[in-house]
């Protein structure tokens, strides 16, 4: 498999620009499933609302699992001080 830097940049830009605050990941999950399916994987949505993907390896002697989060930091700017410092609060 060759690494396509342009595909990587375009895909990263696409997913990084999807709003996905904690508890509201439906939009990013939909896009991730579409992208993974386009790559030939079978991605599904679990009952808990997570994207699941199984990749069969060359050997069944070892099993590897990994996970990642897709939600973004849910903060709101409360005020901006005179020196440019941000005062934030949780959303």
Regions found by a protein language model. Give the residues of each.
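N-terminal hydrophobic/helix-forming segments and targeting peptides
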Residues: 1-91
